[in-house]
Amino acid sequence: MAVKIKLARFGKIRNPQYRISVADARNRRDGRAIEVIGRYHPKEDPSIIEIDSERAQYWLGVGAQPTEPVLQLLKITGDWQKFKGLPGAEGTLKHKEPKPSKLDLFNAALAEAEGGPSTEATTPKKKKAPAKKDEQPTEKAAEPAAEKAAEPAAEAPAEAAAESEAPAAE
């Protein structure tokens, strides 16, 4: 049985995505595959090329013939050079740079805006000195009120004592 390593297309219109599959050469393009060994997304920047190198080496070793587009992908990943024993087995595959985290972006913007990283609140705090001045008059106002409350309390026991004496006299 003639076995080919070929691209099976899937994805939306004008957004092609491919599976790199091992299939019988007589099967149609998107037909039944023996094994899927990778994927290829040409519309990404840079293109996503993922090939299971171990499985590709196995299928090339048992005689599977890659189609021309798959051969180019195998050269980019370095699997073809490894199979043939040629120099350059590391390949020329480009990797996407990792995106910076949102926390790093926020800290950078904060440092740019204020001149240094700060974990404090972004709004300025109110000064406490005027608040202390306001507290002193309220304490003074509270003292006379306490004195006034103490006076009726002092009179109340005297009245209670006077009442207790009055019934005893009768």
UniProtKB/Swiss-Prot annotation:
InterPro entries: Ribosomal_bS16, Ribosomal_bS16_CS, Ribosomal_bS16_dom_sf. Belongs to the bacterial ribosomal protein bS16 family. It holds the Pfam family Ribosomal_S16. Residues 109-170 are annotated as: Disordered. One of its GO terms (molecular function) is structural constituent of ribosome. Transmembrane segments: none annotated. This is Small ribosomal subunit protein bS16. GO terms for cellular component: cytoplasm; small ribosomal subunit. HAMAP family: Ribosomal_bS16. Residues 151-170 have a biased composition (Low complexity). PROSITE patterns: RIBOSOMAL_S16.
